[in-house]
């Protein structure tokens, strides 16, 4: 059945070339909405801890199913939010833009359902090409070329050690199937080979998350990318690193309880704290949201390295919740940029008086971003905090201060953008469009559904 989703994306790309120009945007949204519905139907019964083999190389389980659904769910939302870019593009440019989003969605479906390490690596690298095109072609400023260079350098060259590790695994185990490799190396792998695999592979995953210290490409890419690129990058592409760590963590189990693992947990939690402090100092709205993603993903990486059931469940919950919240924040920031022409918080103040209904969406998303009850972010952060304290109680001050600063910059986003007197240059802005309320509502709807029944996936995992 996973082949159905992949073939559907191929059909979407083909149909995009044939749709009349006056129906291109609506047709693309309709097709991507059908893909979202199809993913919910196909993956409805896959919330169990075991693999659901759909072919010899594709499968889904508790880890991959929510991320696949999230990828399909955000595709139509990204197109809805990209109406401004499509209006300013030619007919050919609009078709290429839509096809790039479809290609990224299809590649993500294969990535999250891949059973082969080499297929996983190839498809992850494939997602870089359309993302680079979105950044360099539809970026807002001339710095987009430099942002694309940073993006390719960090993600492409950072993942080359993973290819070396995959070759070493194949030589050692004669198999690249993820379940087989987990069994073979977890039982028969030497400490030296496992340590080498650890050192080589986490560099790739740290770049993709990214954690603090490997993050220099992310703010540049987010600031220069179009709204669809920022939404997909923050919501899905950053989760590939966390997914890879969660999927292959069994390879690390024999050396997990040592100083290296604890050092990485301390490194990730300390990075989350430093990033939260950096967020408080930001004046650019998109850069602030981008740095907040680095902080959240650093906490996710620390939880995965704890290798506890609570840590894994909290990491998965926070990845899904952060994907929805960060995507919504970037789309709302784009609505401000389209009206004011700037992302500086000092200029975009007083929006509550100009766009009163949008203030509600800003309030809900900022509250979810800081982990206000009963948001899924809070549930994930509680599980992660519990797992980290079980490793060392001395991690509590670091994570605690990171959460405090996270609350500060989340409230700062809302206060600086919505409160105060509007700047004179943005007083005569046009009112909100219905499509803007639509994509904001489509972001908050899954969060509400997770709030209603947050533990269904976690109970299935524990079983």
From Swiss-Prot:
Its EC number is 7.1.1.2. InterPro entries: NADH4_N, NADH_Q_OxRdtase_chainM/4, NADH_UbQ_OxRdtase, ND/Mrp_TM. The chain crosses the membrane at residues 24-44, 62-82, 98-118, 119-139, 151-171, 198-218, 232-252, 260-280, 285-305, 310-330, 353-373, 404-424, 442-462. Its main location: mitochondrion. It is found in: Mitochondrion membrane. Belongs to the complex I subunit 4 family. Core subunit of the mitochondrial membrane respiratory chain NADH dehydrogenase (Complex I) that is believed to belong to the minimal assembly required for catalysis. Complex I functions in the transfer of electrons from NADH to the respiratory chain. The immediate electron acceptor for the enzyme is believed to be ubiquinone. This is NADH-ubiquinone oxidoreductase chain 4. The lineage of its organism: Eukaryota, Metazoa, Echinodermata, Eleutherozoa, Echinozoa. The gene is ND4.
């Amino acid at each position: 059945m996973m082949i159905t989703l992949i073939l559907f994306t191929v059909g979407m790309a083909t149909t995009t070339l044939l749709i009349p120009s006056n129906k291109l945007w609506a047709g693309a949204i309709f097709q991507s909405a059908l893909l979202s519905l199809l993913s919910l139907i196909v993956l409805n019964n896959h919330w169990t801890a075991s693999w659901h083999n759909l072919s010899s190389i594709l499968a889904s389980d508790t880890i991959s199913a929510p991320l696949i659904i999230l990828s399909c769910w955000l595709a139509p939302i990204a197109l809805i939010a990209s109406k401004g870019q499509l209006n300013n593009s030619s007919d050919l440019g609009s078709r290429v833009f839509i096809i790039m989003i479809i290609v990224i969605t299809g590649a993500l479906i294969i990535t999250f359902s891949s059973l082969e390490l080499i297929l996983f690596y190839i498809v992850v690298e494939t997602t870089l090409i359309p993302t680079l095109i979105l950044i360099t072609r539809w970026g807002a400023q001339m710095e987009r070329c430099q942002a694309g260079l940073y993006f390719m350098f960090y993600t492409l060259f950072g993942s080359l050690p993973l290819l070396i590790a995959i070759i070493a695994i194949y030589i050692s185990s004669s198999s690249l199937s993820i379940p087989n490799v987990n069994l073979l190396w977890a039982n028969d792998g030497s400490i030296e080979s496992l340590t080498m695999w650890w050192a080589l592979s986490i560099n790739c995953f740290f770049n993709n998350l990214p954690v603090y210290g490997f993050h220099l490409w992310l703010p540049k890419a987010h600031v220069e990318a179009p709204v669809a690129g920022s939404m997909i990058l923050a919501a899905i592409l950053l989760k590939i690193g966390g997914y890879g760590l969660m999927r292959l963590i069994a390879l690390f189990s024999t050396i997990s309880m040592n100083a290296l693992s604890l050092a990485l947990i301390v490194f990730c939690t300390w990075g989350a704290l430093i990033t939260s402090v950096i967020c408080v100092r930001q004046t650019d709205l998109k850069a602030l949201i981008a740095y907040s993603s680095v902080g959240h993903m650093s906490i996710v990486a620390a939880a995965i390295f704890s290798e506890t059931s609570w840590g894994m469940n909290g990491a998965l919950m926070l990845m899904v919740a952060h994907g929805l919240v960060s995507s919504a924040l970037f789309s709302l920031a784009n609505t401000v940029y389209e009206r004011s022409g700037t992302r500086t918080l000092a200029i975009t103040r007083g929006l509550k008086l100009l766009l009163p209904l949008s203030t509600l969406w800003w309030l809900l998303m900022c509250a979810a971003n800081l982990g206000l009850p009963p948001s899924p972010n809070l549930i994930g952060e509680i599980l992660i905090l519990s797992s980290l304290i079980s490793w060392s109680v001395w991690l509590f001050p670091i994570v605690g201060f990171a959460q405090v600063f996270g609350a500060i910059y989340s409230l700062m986003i809302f206060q600086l953008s919505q409160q105060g007197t509007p700047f004179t240059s943005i007083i005569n802005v046009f009112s909100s469009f219905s499509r803007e309320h639509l994509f904001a509502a489509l972001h908050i709807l899954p969060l509400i559904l997770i709030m209603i029944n947050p533990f269904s996936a976690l109970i299935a995992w524990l079983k």
